Amino acid sequence: MSTLPDIDQFRKEARVWLEQNAEPLPEINEAEEEDQEVVWGEGSDNVAIFHNFTDEEELARLNAVKAWQAKKFDAGYAMINWPEELGGRGLPASYVRAYMAEERKFKIPSAGELPPTSMGLIAPTVAAFGTPEQKEKWCKPIMRMDICGCQLFSEPSAGSDLASLTTRAVRDGDEWVLNGQKVWTSGARFSEWGLAITRSDFDVPKHKGLTAFMVPFDWKGVEVRPIKQMSGGANFNEVFLTDARIPDEFRLGPVGEGWRVALTCLGFERDHSSSSSSSHTGGSFKQVVAAARW
């Protein structure tokens, strides 16, 4: 006999909670919206993929998301399908979908790039490879957005071929000395931690010599620099690691298993992208299509 709560009752309770904590969105007649034509010169012509917020505006948006996520976490809706031993409710993914179907009807703070990366990629990767102490240290704080984490994967000469990365990790007792540069890192300026894939062994095939670390951004030898876009914003960052001494307790997964950690994280990224609705920062999808045809 199933011990799962009735999903319709679960959805009803979620709706009640949302009504008490968020503003409902106006109902949209999708048929009428579909019939509307794009008229040049009317409305916004912004079809940008990336936003152009100032750091102050970006931080204000992030703080709004953090406040919402803390509410959501405390009410039990942030880790619905996470295992109970990690602080979740242990429910199937169908309950997540049921909750999200209700949440989409409400005005929720816009997440931007960092929160989905932090909660959808970094936290589950820690859950997959972390020690009990690491899971306790990072999973729930990330899912409540008390802290944020980003990916430190790409390098100037290692983008699509990630396994060719050269950021070096050399063991020195109970520490690792990291040296190298990461690039195109979304959200690094507002993150407390970064999941870095490094090369710890140059004498084995490139996929086998990688090791993963959780790198604290307030650490000596860790520097974050924004990459300014021509449009004025700075969605991406460079992260420089210069003799950054990282404790072995921050290593995620076994030595030499960084490739497996990276693939797992990228797998979560694909899952997250496929389950999310198509969206971008600028105008409607119809505007993008119209601009492409113009």
What are these regions (language model features)?
Residues 1-117, 134-137, 141, 148, ...:
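Amphipathic, small/basic residue-rich leader segments at the start of a protein or domain
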Residues 5, 222-294:
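Glycine-rich beta->alpha junctions and the first turn(s) of the following alpha-helix
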Residues 76, 99-105, 197-198, 214-220, ...:
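Short Ser/Thr-interspersed hydrophobic loop/turn segments at strand-loop and sheet-helix junctions
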Residues 114-133, 159:
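N-terminal glycine-rich flavin-associated loop
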Residues 145-153:
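A short, Trp-centered hydrophobic/proline-enriched beta-strand micro-motif
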Residues 157-160, 184-187, 202-204, 228-235:
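Short Gly/Pro-enriched turn/cap motifs at secondary-structure boundaries
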Residues 167-170:
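A structural signal for short hydrophobic beta-strand segments in well-ordered beta-sheet cores
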Residues 175, 179-225:
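A short core secondary-structure module
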